[in-house]
Every structure is written in structure tokens, then in C-alpha cells.
Amino acid sequence: MNKLISISGPTAVGKTKFSIDLAKKINCEIISFDSRQFYREMSIGTAVPKKNELIQVKHHFIQHKSIHDYYNINQFSIDAKKLINELFKKNKYIILVGGSFLYLKSIIYGINNVPEIPSEVRHALNTEFDNKGIDYLRKLLKELDPKYYDLSLIH
């Protein structure tokens, strides 16, 4: 029977070392569910595994995207489940490691289909942000959806 092993917790508590040591003992690969470690340009403050750690055991979803690429939890969930199915053809175990618990939950329980945001909308909002700043966007959100604004942690 195939098994997923999850190692989760906050940044810099030793998840990487523990997961590598365990993966070497049980001969398996590691899938990261740390949403900040996906991006090549985000090495500082994310505790991304060092090169000498990455060569010890095969890692997936580590610095595989650019911050300029659109990548959301729905895409991650689809990619991770596909990879898990492939890895289970050759491995009895897979280690999931990270601190982005919503991303872990998306693997285990699935996630509602997140609709794609048209690139024109993303571009328009980024332009508004560049030209008018975050305070303007917060005010706009409060006007358009006061209930969500009150529930969110953005103010």
C-alpha cells in the first residue's frame, strides 16, 4: 500500500533536514507544498533548500516557477496529484513537506475549482496598483464588497 507522509510546520524548524534524512532511509522523493518556495526569485526569507540538500534527494515544486508566471492553488493541486500518481508507480512512499497548510489540504481533500482570472483583469489591477497604490485598491474593495472587506485581513 502506498503512503503519503506529511511533514509540516512553520519556516526554519528543521522540516527540510528531517524530510531528507527520512527520504534517504525509506528511498522516496519529496514534494514541497510551500507556496513561497515555488518561485526561483524568492530565495531570501523562504528557507528554500540549499543546492547540497536538493541533490541528496529528488525534490519537486522547488523554484520551478517564476514570480512572473501565474500559478495558483488550483493549478498546484492538479500538478501535485498528477505527480503523486506518477511517483506511486515507482515508490511506496512520498514525503510532502512545507508550511502552506492550505496547499497541503488541497492535495488531501481537493479544492473547489478556482476560476481563472482573465489576464486582462490581472493586468488592469496591476496597473491600478502601480499607478494608485494599495490604499486605493483597499478602498475600492471596501466599496464593491464591504462584507468581504470586513472579513479579510487586508485593512
Outline where the language-model segments fall.
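Phosphate/pyrophosphate-binding catalytic cores of soluble transferases and nucleic-acid-acting enzymes
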Residues: M1-H155
